[in-house]
Every structure is written in structure tokens, then in C-alpha cells.
Amino acid sequence: SVSKSAASITYEVFDDTGRKLTFNKKPERIVSLTYGTDEILTELVDLKRMVAFSRWAGDSEISFITKEQALAVGCKVADNLEAILKLEPDLVVASVATSNDVVQSLENIGIPVYIVRSPHNYQEMCAKIKNLAAAVGESKKGDVIIKNMDNRLHNLEVKLSHLPSYQRKVAVAFNFTSAMGRKGDLLDSILTMAHVINGAAAVTPPVSEHKSVVISKEMVVTINPDIFLLPIWNYNNKQDVQGYYYEIMNDPAYKNVKAVQNRQLKFVSDKYRYVASQHIVDAVEKIARTVYPELF
């Protein structure tokens, strides 16, 4: 519902949680509190319209925002009400994980807050981009981003379609505590799109919002995967990446697993496994190149 006058355009949108936001002009002082929305907004709006990125912007292990882009925006902010208010934003983009107190306080002051969910698959990711594009008044640009994603994915699919189904490899991805990638979560979707069989999906119940299931060593042994995908993001300086590699290689529980016997332990950056933007296509390509280098 767009009514135009010489001075302003009024439009309304719904965020991912169904809350209605009304704008009388395109937002020009945007604060993004999540790394995924940093990345989406960077392709939707001129950086002059961004007053702050999330705290991870420019960290190449988790964010696709370059150091140059982070410097151009010049400010990073966490879920801190005072820090956000100082920036005088006309739109704050948050996630369902953002503190409810912060969201409420911003709304009470009259600052629009757009909340995104975490997509579980490609369709939901495209919807996230399309909806956010509408919120910042850039629907056409949103469509262009999605078209580019579709094209890149199609080209990748052409390469991967040469692989007979019996040659698909089974992979299990790990974070620093255990195996990950339950059926129905985003990593499961990414592996499937890369023509990789997600070992963890076979032994876990589908994702539900409330239950987190630990994938045990015994489950991993039962799966007997061809490849282990290991993490490399040392987010709190306490993770020993190389040490974790040796720990898994030398774990007696895994000694008969194909991945260990054939030394197929590969590192995949967390910016791919926890992707939350149009870069999902980069994640699919990264996994495919890691598991099937011979196709590239």
C-alpha cells in the first residue's frame, strides 16, 4: 500500500515475526545488529545509509563484510541501548535473539525495529532478503540479489549433476564440542544442495525450536562418514584449532571411521556453516569444492 506525495512515500512492511512497520520515507540511518543483515544490507543500500554494523563485521572468520566496508561504515554496535540511541537511527535491524528489553525500549521511543529469523533453507533465505529489501525501500535490488543467487546455484548444480548418486560422499560437520547439522537445519540444507550426504541427519530427530540434540561419538561411528568438516573460528581465543584436529584424528573411538583412516578431515570456515545471507550460495560452493575438488 504505497501512497505518493511530493514530499514523501509512505509504505508499510511486515518483518519475519509478522510485526508491522510503517515508513514515510526510505530509512537513511540504519543500524544492523546481526552479521547476516550486515551482509544483506550492504548489497541493498548505499553504505552512506548504514550508521552501524554488528560487532562481527570485518571478522573474516564469521562475516563476509570486508575490512574496507566495515571502515567505511565506521561503527560497530552490540545489543546496547545507549550505543544504538547515540547513532540516532531511523531503522534498527535485529534478530529474534536480540534482547527483548532493547527492542521494547527502541519501540517505546518510536524507533522502528525490524526483526529477522534464522532461515533453515534456501527458500527461507530468499524470503529474508526479499522482506528486508522491502523494508529499506529497495525491492528491485532484492529481486536482483535473488536472481544472481539462483543463477549461481544453477551453474553449480550443472557441475554437481555430473556426479552419480552412488559417488556422493557422507560428511559429518563438527563444532568445538560435538558433531552438528541436524535434519532440517540450515547446514543440513547447505550440504544437501552441495550433493553431500549429511551424516548427522540420519541419526537425529528433525529440528525443533525447543530440543537440542547432542550427536554422540557413537552416532558418528555408526554413520562412518567419508569426511569430517572441522571448525576454524577461534571466537573467544580459547579454541585450539590444530589441537582439535589432532584430538579427533587420534580419538580411539574414531580409529575405524573412514574419514580418519583416509585422513579426510577438512576445515570449513564458520562464515560458511553459519551463513545468514545471500552468501548461502558461497557456502554451498565452498562445501562442494571441499568434498569434490575433482569437479572444479
Where are these regions (language model features)?
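Short, low-complexity disordered leader/linker segments with a strong preference
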Residues: S1-F23
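Short secondary-structure boundary segments
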Residues: T34, V96, S118, P231-Y235, ...
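Short helix-initiation/N-cap motifs at beta->coil->alpha
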Residues: D16-G18, L71-E82, P119, P205-K217
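His/Asp/Glu-enriched short active-site or ligand-binding loop at hydrolase and phosphoryl-transfer sites
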Residues: L186-E209, F267
